[in-house]
Amino acid sequence: FLGRLKTALSARALTLFGVTTDGSALYPAPLREVFADVPHQICTFHIVAEVNKAVLGAVASARKGLAATQPKLPRGRPSTQAAQAAARTKKRLAGQCAALFTHRYLFVQRHLNTTERKTLWRVSRGLPQLQELRAIMEQVYAVFDRRCRTQTALDKLATLRRRVQRFKALGDTLKKLFSPTLEKALTFLDDK
């Protein structure tokens, strides 16, 4: 396929300035073979989508962990003070789980207005790891900001990687941020 593309480009006297792929391991070797001197970059949307998927997975696991802490209640109306307190706790935790599920998109949305920030704060109250996830997502979006140059983005990426390393639980979730192909996704920032 790439050989035919190169032939078609040369037949029309067109020049290939760059190639963008989805980050699959299938592309680099054939691209080097056919287009040796053409820069190859990774599509930023695929990387952000993978990070978003990991963040939503972390939100889901936090929600499941919260649901697991709900007290088990016997059937029927709670009669003792302890049973009533357990019922209130269960109702509160179930409401927080439902709110986390309903508003999970707020953890990965690029821009939040004031109302959405308040909702996110209310939903993630008592779960500092989720608040940290949102702060990290804002840094991820800042890395891919079109207004900065590649070197600035690489500096932001280094800062982001150091921040993620400080939180051991988040390090496993966001291991995509340590991928060596991530730097290749930032080459588009110097394009005019």
Predicted segments with their positions:
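Inter-helix linker motif
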Residues: A36-A60, K64
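Internal, charge-rich low-complexity segments
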Residues: A54-A82
